[in-house]
Amino acid sequence: MTTKHDVKTFQGFIMTLQEYWAQQGCAIVQPLDMEVGAGTFHPMTFLRSLGPEPMSSAYVQPSRRPTDGRYGENPNRLQHYYQFQVVLKPSPSNMQELYLGSLEALGVDMNVHDVRFVEDNWESPTLGAWGLGWEIWLNGMEVSQFTYFQQVGGLECKPVTGEITYGLERLAMYIQEVDSVYDLVWTDGPLGKVMYGDIFHQNEVEQSTYNFEHADVDVQFKMFDDCEQACQRLLALEKPLPLPAYEQVMKASHAFNLLDARHAISVTERQRYILRVRTMAKGVAEAYYQAREALGFPMCK
């Protein structure tokens, strides 16, 4: 595939992936407008993996992991970063070839570079999800994750959904041949180069300070409890509302992550909180499946 985008910029790199996967039949959807720890939390992955309805999509997802912040001092550890998520349901038999084709679209020559699939089964305890998977290494560095979902929200995936997750910054650093994420060229236009650091370095410094030092522990504990109660209430309605309930799951999960960054939760409590999120996610998954079933699984027609 030829592309008109400059893959030596972060902007062009993302646009190339979007164009490639659009040509493979994916709906290019937009990022979720909430704090999530990974692209898997997006409803297009978590909820659309449930039930028999086919769906292929791809999207960029800003992801937040408060404990990974380093005050902007580490060249490759960030509390806010980007994933590119591809969801293929049912999973095609040539998923590996499609992925390699995306690397070629980004200018990675398979005859020159060493691409390896290293077995690494995936699990998300908070989402009650797991799958058979592989890390994808490019010249010895992990750049993507490849997963065949077996279970989501405690429900078996029929058919199996295939997921590809690209670590955008890490792969872009390789393509641009830079050692620091802040040295990535975001775009190069009439006003000159705009660097990743120009856009995000101050955010990393300030958000790390907030996550580790100023996030109000009492507020976050209350937020978690309030979200849990709201989720339970929405699922207990005569006609449950799984989509709004799922938003409460994501809010509770982020509150938990902030409490984790503040070291406000003991090891024992940590497992209890993870179980509480998983219980919410399982309730949402069951309600969503039942709602789609009541509609007659319309996308199967």
Curated annotation (Swiss-Prot):
<dbReference type="GO" id="GO:0005829">
    <property type="term" value="C:cytosol"/>
</dbReference>
<keyword id="KW-0030">Aminoacyl-tRNA synthetase</keyword>
<comment type="similarity">
    <text>Belongs to the class-II aminoacyl-tRNA synthetase family.</text>
</comment>
<dbReference type="InterPro" id="IPR006194">
    <property type="entry name" value="Gly-tRNA-synth_heterodimer"/>
</dbReference>
<protein>
    <recommendedName>
        <fullName>Glycine--tRNA ligase alpha subunit</fullName>
        <ecNumber>6.1.1.14</ecNumber>
    </recommendedName>
</protein>
<dbReference type="GO" id="GO:0006426">
    <property type="term" value="P:glycyl-tRNA aminoacylation"/>
</dbReference>
<keyword id="KW-0436">Ligase</keyword>
<comment type="subunit">
    <text>Tetramer of two alpha and two beta subunits.</text>
</comment>
<dbReference type="GO" id="GO:0005524">
    <property type="term" value="F:ATP binding"/>
</dbReference>
<dbReference type="InterPro" id="IPR045864">
    <property type="entry name" value="aa-tRNA-synth_II/BPL/LPL"/>
</dbReference>
<keyword id="KW-0547">Nucleotide-binding</keyword>
<keyword id="KW-0963">Cytoplasm</keyword>
<dbReference type="Pfam" id="PF02091">
    <property type="entry name" value="tRNA-synt_2e"/>
</dbReference>
<dbReference type="GO" id="GO:0004820">
    <property type="term" value="F:glycine-tRNA ligase activity"/>
</dbReference>
<keyword id="KW-0067">ATP-binding</keyword>
<keyword id="KW-0648">Protein biosynthesis</keyword>
<dbReference type="InterPro" id="IPR002310">
    <property type="entry name" value="Gly-tRNA_ligase_asu"/>
</dbReference>
